Design a protein with these regions (language model features):
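Generic beta-strand structural signal
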Residues: 115-117, 121-122, 133-135, 150-156, ...
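Short, conserved beta-strand element in jelly-roll/cupin
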Residues: 145-162, 219-222, 227, 251-254
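Non-heme Fe(II)/2-oxoglutarate
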Residues: 2-22, 69-70, 74, 167, ...
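Short, structured patches in soluble enzyme cores that scaffold and shape functional sites
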Residues: 123, 139, 156-160, 169-171
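Double-stranded beta-helix
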Residues: 163-232
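Non-heme Fe(II)-dependent double-stranded beta-helix
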Residues: 2-39, 44-137, 143-145, 263, ...
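Short, charged/polar surface micro-motifs in flexible loops or helix N-caps
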Residues: 114, 129-131, 160-163, 175, ...
């Protein structure tokens, strides 16, 4: 793919920015780093050049249409159905190039304050408009066999999103209780129904008591990046009838990573 092709296709991406920094790491301020440490989440605008967004879009097209990558369908056949694919890095060359050559690792390294970084996983999430409801509130840590302060998920949307459609986060919740995961088969009836059983405290019903929580979300344009600690409570807003939400999360960890024993089950993403 030559530069003209990249520029032409990049111009078709909705919401892409006309101006961006040659060194986006310099856009991360001490206040951003402090906010991440305090709240467990921070959004920074205009970090990724349209060329990198195009590369991710091509990679997603390959995942959905060409590869043998398994598509995990959550709430299959229900109104909230969405697609997730895990460890695309292993099989999709565009994702490998993004992880190695884009500034994403340097951006995460500055946010979490670690000079050394390791890739844990990457995941695509695809929600088509019209019938996809909320993604239930949850933390990622109950599903992962790791813990530490220097862990971050960089969430990148390929589509412009309103504040209502964006992910939502409970600020500061990464410093509190680690709750059980949600039960996909029961969550529509009871969002606090446990994934494991009685080995971890059940999730609170955040959606029914939103006024009790410091909930953060943003209007997003392609090129913006949300950095979030896996321990922060979060959930996905519904997509509107004429919109879609295609996003990738790059999960990286730094020097203070520790193995964490979880209740007996297969981890969502094994530590390999």
């Amino acid at each position: 793919m030559n530069e003209n092709q990249v520029n032409r296709r990049s111009s078709e991406l909705p919401g892409t920015v006309e101006k961006f920094s040659d060194d986006p790491v310099t856009l991360i301020t001490p206040n951003d780093m402090e906010q991440y440490k305090k709240d467990g989440v921070v959004m920074i605008k205009n970090l990724l050049h349209p060329e990198w967004l195009l590369l991710l879009e091509v990679g997603l097209e390959r995942v959905l249409n060409e590869s043998s990558q398994r598509l995990h369908k959550f709430f299959e056949g229900q109104e909230g159905e969405f697609i997730e694919t895990i460890r695309n890095f292993d099989v999709i060359p565009e994702i490998r190039r993004f992880v190695y050559d884009s500034p994403i690792a340097d951006l995460v390294g500055k946010i979490i304050g670690s000079q050394n970084l390791w890739l844990y996983s990457d995941e695509f999430f695809v929600k088509e408009g019209g019938n996809a409801e909320r993604t239930p509130w949850h933390q990622d840590t109950p599903y992962w066999p790791i813990e530490g302060e220097q862990i971050a998920s960089a969430w990148i949307s390929l589509d412009p999103l309103s504040k209502i459609e964006c992910l939502e986060y409970v600020a500061g919740s990464h410093k509190g209780t680690m709750y059980d995961g949600f039960s996909p088969s029961k969550v529509s009836e009871d969002p606090t129904a446990p994934h494991y059983g009685d080995q971890l405290p059940p999730l609170p019903d955040i959606e029914a008591n939103r006024e009790e929580y410091d909930i953060r979300s943003w209007e997003i344009s392609p090129g913006d990046v949300i950095f979030a600690h896996p321990g922060v409570l979060h959930g996905g807003g519904p997509t509107g009838p004429d919109s879609r939400r295609r996003a990738i999360t790059i999960r990286l960890y730094g020097n203070d990573l520790r193995y964490a024993k979880r209740p007996p089950t297969r981890p969502t993403v094994p530590l390999t």
